[in-house]
């Protein structure tokens, strides 16, 4: 159930996690939260968000039973400062762990953005650090120019960071790691895109390649 207002929105029931790709914290292992989210849009391009629920419990009646092992609580403030700067600050309670998270993005130009994220576990001496860049460039094939998107980052996750690390969308393991991805349009007519991605964490590597199809109608 979702209700949108002029000043924000409220979602109730089984809701998506909405974590951004840049912060690499998409909680796709379980994928959904059973609970409630409220977003309040504030002045000066800022917003306040609160989420309360269960990360993996399929029983809706347990969505507000704070204290269970799969509880999920998040309070976040996000803001944009002009056209170049934006940031997020949040506190989280996930799977018996407490965390403070900060993310900063800087838009270098029309095509490129650099970012930095720090997630500090407050009940343990452990952290997750990410920094990198995303954007778009043009490649020429047979005299034609094709836009290609890229996404690259370095990350470090402490070995005692806890189960929250395993919920990260592209989690391979703790330690030093990095990721490089390229993607582009394969067919505009069929809403088809291609992608190639390489993930490396210490001695573990993973290569992903494929196509994505969108069922959303283009304007």
Walk through the language-model features, giving the residues of each.
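Outer membrane beta-barrel
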Residues: 1-60, 78, 159
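Outer-membrane beta-barrel and related beta-rich outer-membrane complex signature
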Residues: 24, 60-64, 164, 206-208
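Short, solvent-exposed loop/turn segments at conserved positions within beta-propeller repeat blades
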Residues: 29-31, 66-70
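A conserved mid-domain beta-alpha-beta active-site/ligand-binding segment of alpha/beta enzyme cores
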Residues: 55, 73, 90-94
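Alpha-helical scaffold segments
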Residues: 56-58, 69, 84
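Outer-membrane beta-barrel pore domains
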Residues: 78, 84-219
